[in-house]
Amino acid sequence: MEEAHNMREIRLREIVVNHAVLSSCLDKCGDCFASEAARIKFDNDIEAIFELKRKRNAVILAHNYQTPEIFHGVADIVGDSLALARKAIDVDADVIVLAGVHFMAETAKLLNPEKTVLIPDMEAGCSLAESITPEDVALLRQTYPGIPIVTYVNTSAAVKAASDICCTSGNAKKVVEALGVPKVLMIPDEYLARNVAKETEVQIISWHGHCEVHELFSASDILQLRENHPGVTVLAHPECPPDVVAAADFAGSTAAMSDYVTTKQPKRVVLLTECSMSDNIAVHHPDVEFISSCNLCPHMKRITLANIRTALEENRHEVTVDAKIAAPARRAVERMLAI
């Protein structure tokens, strides 16, 4: 255990020291080394988390938007929403700590009803999840009878339960077309729905939810980036406005962005998404210049080493889903995973 801790600590220090591109979005990790006392606390948190994972037979699932000290330092499984949902099914542990936002923890619980699922901060929410309620879904069914409802995973379990099938930004087009119908409702992300609609012949009716991180990007941002950084490759998340996606060189989920950088190896690239995405993959691509142009998600940043440690120590913030909601919500998620 000590050797594993030391290796991860060394790796993390290398990230901080050798990759200046991380500095703009590594405020917490930078602060860790601002004083001797902070460094000691940082080291103690890392070591304690590894020991607690061992004692409790726990695993940490971390989203790509988590800070590098979590993503590279303590996480056992990392990925985008789709990857975490798929991998959660096969987790061999008694306890799952979801280093992400609440809807992700609910999804992990839906797929692992017998396991203890913890979220380090119960207030880690999501603007998309908060943009729609089960009552809204019921009204949509009345307004558009017989039309399937495809629900983005960035929603509460209660909204999933009122839906027909889920999707992620990585499989939305595939899910929509797999239904074999001419028209669907896609909720709650308006921009994701509009971007998918451009790629398929299926007619898509959208809701009015937006991601507070991705809605801030604009096509003028891309023009400025290209002017300031000639030859830059622009990757955009499909939660961005359609004119941003149209102006980008590539649009895809965070997993697709990572794969693009790995396979294409652009000389310089900018990721129009949450800041930690670039931070976390830059370490694996020292020959790629990552241009900083990102927005922080305040909800993702509520997760810290300290509250991960507390969650494991005190079994704090256990996630539960009412049985009447869990069964239909699980079906909607499982239908997606089966495609």
UniProtKB/Swiss-Prot annotation:
It catalyses: iminosuccinate + dihydroxyacetone phosphate = quinolinate + phosphate + 2 H2O + H(+). Keywords: 4Fe-4S, Cytoplasm, Iron, Iron-sulfur, Metal-binding, Pyridine nucleotide biosynthesis, Transferase. It comes from the Bacteria. It is an enzyme of class 2 (transferase). Its EC number is 2.5.1.72. Its cofactor is [4Fe-4S] cluster. [4Fe-4S] cluster binds at C126, C211, C297. Binds 1 [4Fe-4S] cluster per subunit. GO terms for molecular function: 4 iron, 4 sulfur cluster binding; metal ion binding; quinolinate synthetase A activity. GO terms for biological process: 'de novo' NAD biosynthetic process from L-aspartate. Pfam families: NadA. Iminosuccinate binds at H63, S81, Y152, V153, N154, S169, H237, P238, E239, T254. Pathway: Cofactor biosynthesis; NAD(+) biosynthesis; quinolinate from iminoaspartate: step 1/1. GO terms for cellular component: cytosol. SUPFAM superfamilies: NadA-like (SSF142754). It is found in: Cytoplasm. PANTHER family: QUINOLINATE SYNTHASE, CHLOROPLASTIC (PTHR30573:SF0), QUINOLINATE SYNTHETASE A (PTHR30573). Catalyzes the condensation of iminoaspartate with dihydroxyacetone phosphate to form quinolinate. Belongs to the quinolinate synthase family. Type 2 subfamily. This is Quinolinate synthase. The lineage of its organism: Bacteria, Pseudomonadati, Pseudomonadota, Gammaproteobacteria, Lysobacterales. The gene is nadA.
